């Protein structure tokens, strides 16, 4: 009896691989049949042309995007190189302005009377300091650093720093009437704003009342 049970079990084990192979063959046959059906389906020339046209349009869009990205990268690189060339010495130039200020203070410490009465040694020293300052400023200017001396100009908060106000009836309001310390720029960037005194309330400045009256009169009233 045990022998019969073993034979039945063995028979089932032998049939299991056969069933799996049959299922695999069925799947493969189904896939081949589907592919054959696809090949058998006729594709019109119009469909082919439409598909090719769409692919061509997609390629054009990708090419345009790539061209635009490359152009933007080229412009950005050029701008970065130009900025590095112009502004690369900004920190160094700012530090050198302190040296120039000290030279100027040294010159201001020697009065005109003292210079007139000075011996040849002191005169030579003063002239040497003046030449050094001029050479330093000329070198900075060759590298794009420009001096801002706005005396008599309208106050501009982008380039000037107001230190005090001066009542002055002879000039328009917000006119720079005194430069305490000149400013410097490099390119369109401010290295140091000019420290200035600004006029307050001159009669040449148009009053709000007069402006309002002229606006109310219009062109005919003017």
Curated annotation (Swiss-Prot):
A GO biological-process term: protein folding
UniProt keyword annotation of Ligase present: no
Location within or outside the cell: Cytoplasm
Region (Disordered): 1-21, 200-222
Keywords for the protein's UniProt record, in alphabetical order: Chaperone, Cytoplasm, Stress response
Main localization, broad class: cytoplasm
Matching CDD domains: GrpE
Subunit composition and interactions: Homodimer.
UniProt function note: Participates actively in the response to hyperosmotic and heat shock by preventing the aggregation of stress-denatured proteins, in association with DnaK and GrpE. It is the nucleotide exchange factor for DnaK and may function as a thermosensor. Unfolded proteins bind initially to DnaJ; upon interaction with the DnaJ-bound protein, DnaK hydrolyzes its bound ATP, resulting in the formation of a stable complex. GrpE releases ADP from DnaK; ATP binding to DnaK triggers the release of the substrate protein, thus completing the reaction cycle.
Protein name: Protein GrpE
Native organism: Chelativorans sp. (strain BNC1)
Primary gene name: grpE
């Amino acid at each position: 009896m045990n022998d019969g049970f073993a034979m039945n079990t063995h028979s089932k084990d032998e049939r299991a691989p056969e069933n799996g192979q049959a299922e695999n063959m069925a799947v493969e046959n189904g896939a081949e049949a589907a592919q054959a059906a696809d090949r058998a389906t006729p594709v019109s020339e119009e469909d082919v042309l439409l598909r090719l046209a769409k692919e061509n349009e997609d390629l054009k869009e990708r090419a345009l995007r790539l061209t635009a990205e490359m152009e933007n990268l080229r412009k950005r690189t050029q701008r970065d190189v130009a900025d590095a060339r112009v502004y690369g010495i900004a920190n160094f130039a700012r530090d050198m302005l302190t040296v120039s200020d000290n030279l100027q203070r040294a010159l201001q410490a020697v009065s005109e009377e003292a210079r007139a009465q000075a011996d040849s040694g002191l005169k030579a020293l003063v002239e040497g300091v003046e030449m050094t300052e001029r050479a330093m400023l000329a070198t900075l200017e060759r590298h794009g650093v420009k001096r801002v001396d706005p005396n008599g100009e309208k106050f501009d908060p982008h380039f000037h720093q107001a230190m005090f106000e001066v009542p002055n009836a002879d000039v328009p309001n917000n006119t720079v009437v005194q430069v305490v310390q000149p400013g410097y720029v490099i390119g369109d960037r401010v290295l140091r704003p000019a420290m200035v005194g600004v006029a307050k309330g001159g009669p040449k400045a148009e009053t709000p009342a007069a402006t309002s009256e002229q606006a109310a009169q219009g062109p005919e009233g003017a």
